[in-house]
Amino acid sequence: MTLLFPLIASEGGFGINLNLFETNLINLVIVIGVLYWFLKGFLGGMLERRRETILKDLQDAEKRLKTATIELSKAQEELSAAQQKAEKIRLDGQARAEAIRADGEKRTIQAMAALKQDALADLTAEGARLTEQLRREAALSAIDKALAELPNRLDSKAQAKLIDSSISNLEDV
């Protein structure tokens, strides 16, 4: 053992000194007691103030958390309401666009039908006018031809016979 601890062996061994004055135990107790007595108020007050500050900060944080939670809930409700309103507006817009499109198609079809009827009426009127014009021209041509041939065919006897038959036809009526 002396080989391991040469310093201990040179001092004469390992032991505890129980003499209070040599170990300064009384001085240490007095210094520690005085430090405890003086620092108790100072450190205690400092720690108490720190504890109160921490508690106040925690209470403020809890209040802010509750307020933030309430505001978040309100904001989520408002967001939900806004999304519902936006969806309603979108659906209304689609319905309105569909109604406008259908109305436009209906008006276009009606306008096309009216144009077709007008064109048909114009075509019918033009056909009737052309038919009437052709009749007049045919009648005028026949009259001109008859007038041109009439003097050669009618002599005075034929004229008298024609006049008599016309008068008898008029009397029957």
UniProtKB/Swiss-Prot annotation:
InterPro entries: ATP_synth_b/b'su_bac/chlpt. GO terms for molecular function: proton-transporting ATP synthase activity, rotational mechanism. GO terms for cellular component: plasma membrane-derived thylakoid membrane; proton-transporting ATP synthase complex. It is a single-pass membrane protein. The chain crosses the membrane at residues 25-45. Pfam families: ATP-synt_B. The keyword Translocase does not apply. HAMAP family: ATP_synth_b_bprime. PANTHER family: ATP SYNTHASE SUBUNIT B, CHLOROPLASTIC. F-type ATPases have 2 components, F(1) - the catalytic core - and F(0) - the membrane proton channel. F(1) has five subunits: alpha(3), beta(3), gamma(1), delta(1), epsilon(1). F(0) has four main subunits: a(1), b(1), b'(1) and c(10-14). The alpha and beta chains form an alternating ring which encloses part of the gamma chain. F(1) is attached to F(0) by a central stalk formed by the gamma and epsilon chains, while a peripheral stalk is formed by the delta, b and b' chains. This is ATP synthase subunit b. It comes from Synechococcus sp. (strain CC9311).
